[in-house]
């Protein structure tokens, strides 16, 4: 079996490592000339991604570049704030810290082995894919031709592989992907950046600033570097078809205008956003696509990572779920290979069975994650009365419940490589939070208390007028 991976993303490079472990032949085609450019992005590695990285022998390199999160601060426009120890609690439960680092650094770690092996081809932009019952052929803009048994699109939210898959399927079977065309929507934009250390912001802190129509998420990493995100609600929601033609676009000037407008807003411990902005090393503004596709494959083409699921960054699961995609697909391919032998190419029926099982696994896992990420972004921006109430009057008094909800997202349906030794690190949370739970009564109880609090506040306002 030979796999053609399109895209040197976190999903694509993780898949390369997984296939190497599974002894499956592959080549990875990346359109950029540089595998790990500095684009101002940071990445969070949660326990569910961390344990796969450990199985691949990469986690120790990641760990050298991170400052484990120990505490989380949350602030509100009225000056109220609270601190939670949930990051430390999650580490106790799962054996891995919540880790943030430069996305560039993670890509460098992931790319080192595959690049050295000669299996990564840079500057290879895919322009055409041809699918037959006997295999698949990929052509690049420079005229290179690659053949294999399976194409895996790991080329991001603007995926060329996804577009080619839709084109080929439509030509062969009509509009079988029509229901997928409107799956991605854009309701928010994000300015993300990395700043040099700021006095009064301590390594190991996460700071979330709730506001009306916007929010700020900051993580203080190793040596005090500040990884920050400014989320802004757009005037209207739009549908994104994946072609780059109909989505909103933003310039560096747009980003600067927003950051300067909010420079006076408090972050934490006397620090204002302007202090963070003044130390900014690199930044970028982008629309935030949200959505989960339900059809991931057609014949011998399959897509993974951001090309199939795009989440708001608030719960940190985007990259981790992409890592899981790579591991889950590798599990399915390796199991087939183990049963059939390394020299037998998969038939169309084989691939259909492999990929159908893979997609079923992933959709079961990712549905709740998509809902949680979408809800979190709107909660932080206090979008609507419900989110205003929940954010201000429920979360500060929820105790360990946010850690429990995060634990269910980490452990529920998480993946490891079946054909590699289990990760050495562990914790009770993997078993404790792995099964779906009954709907808790706690949120309903607190919601009732919130209603009482609002009534009291209204009465107080009336009496003091």
Curated annotation (Swiss-Prot):
Its EC number is 1.-.-.-. The gene is pyr5. This is FAD-dependent monooxygenase pyr5. One of its GO terms (biological process) is secondary metabolite biosynthetic process. The lineage of its organism: Eukaryota, Fungi, Dikarya, Ascomycota, Pezizomycotina. One of its GO terms (cellular component) is membrane. The keyword Flavoprotein applies. Gene3D superfamilies: FAD/NAD(P)-binding domain. One of its GO terms (molecular function) is FAD binding. It comes from Aspergillus fumigatus (strain ATCC MYA-4609 / CBS 101355 / FGSC A1100 / Af293) (Neosartorya fumigata). FAD binds at residues 30, 44, 103, 306, 319. Residues 1-16 form the signal peptide.
């Amino acid at each position: 079996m030979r796999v053609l991976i399109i895209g040197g993303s976190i999903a694509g490079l993780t898949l390369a490592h997984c296939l190497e472990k599974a002894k499956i032949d592959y080549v990875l085609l990346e359109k950029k000339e540089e595998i790990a450019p500095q684009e101002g992005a940071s990445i969070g590695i949660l326990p569910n991604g961390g344990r796969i990285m450990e199985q691949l022998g990469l986690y120790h390199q990641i760990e050298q570049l991170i400052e484990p999160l120990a505490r989380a601060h949350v602030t509100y426009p009225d000056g109220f704030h609270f601190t939670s120890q949930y990051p430390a609690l999650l580490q106790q439960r799962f054996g891995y810290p919540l880790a943030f680092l430069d996305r560039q650094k993670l890509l460098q770690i992931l790319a080192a082995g595959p690049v050295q092996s000669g299996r990564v081809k840079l500057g290879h932009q895919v322009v055409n894919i041809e699918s037959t019952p006997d295999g698949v052929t990929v052509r690049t803009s420079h005229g290179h031709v690659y053949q294999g048994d399976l194409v895996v699109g790991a080329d991001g939210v603007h995926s060329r592989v996804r577009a080619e898959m839709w084109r080929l399927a439509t030509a062969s079977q009509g509009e079988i992907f029509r229901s997928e065309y409107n799956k991605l929507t854009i309701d928010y934009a994000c300015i993300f950046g990395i700043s040099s250390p700021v006095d009064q912001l301590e390594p190991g802190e996460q700071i979330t600033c709730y506001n009306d129509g916007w929010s700020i998420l900051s993580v203080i990493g190793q040596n005090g570097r500040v990884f920050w995100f400014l989320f802004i609600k757009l005037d209207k929601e739009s549908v994104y078809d994946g072609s780059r033609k109909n989505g909103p676009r933003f310039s560096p000037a747009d980003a600067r205008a927003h950051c300067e407008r909010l420079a006076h807003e408090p972050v934490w411990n006397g620090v204002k956003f302007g202090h963070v902005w003044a130390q900014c090393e690199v930044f970028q503004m982008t629309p935030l696509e949200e959505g989960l596709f339900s059809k991931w494959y057609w014949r011998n083409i399959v897509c993974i990572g951001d090309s199939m699921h795009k989440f708001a960054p608030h719960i940190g699961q985007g990259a981790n779920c992409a890592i899981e995609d790579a591991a889950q697909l590798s599990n399915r391919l390796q199991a087939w290979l183990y049963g059939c032998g390394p020299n037998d190419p998969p038939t169309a029926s084989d691939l259909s069975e492999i990929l159908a099982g893979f997609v079923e696994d992933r959709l079961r896992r990712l549905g709740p994650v998509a809902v949680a990420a979408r809800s979190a972004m709107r909660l932080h921006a206090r979008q609507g009365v419900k989110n205003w109430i929940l954010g201000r009057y429920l979360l500060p008094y929820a105790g360990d419940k946010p850690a429990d909800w995060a634990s269910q997202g980490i452990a529920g349906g998480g993946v490891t490589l079946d054909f590699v030794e289990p990760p050495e690190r562990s914790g009770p949370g993997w078993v404790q939070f792995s099964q779906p739970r009954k709907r808790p009564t706690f949120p309903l109880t607190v919601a009732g208390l919130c209603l009482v609090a609002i009534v009291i506040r209204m009465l107080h306002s009336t009496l003091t007028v």
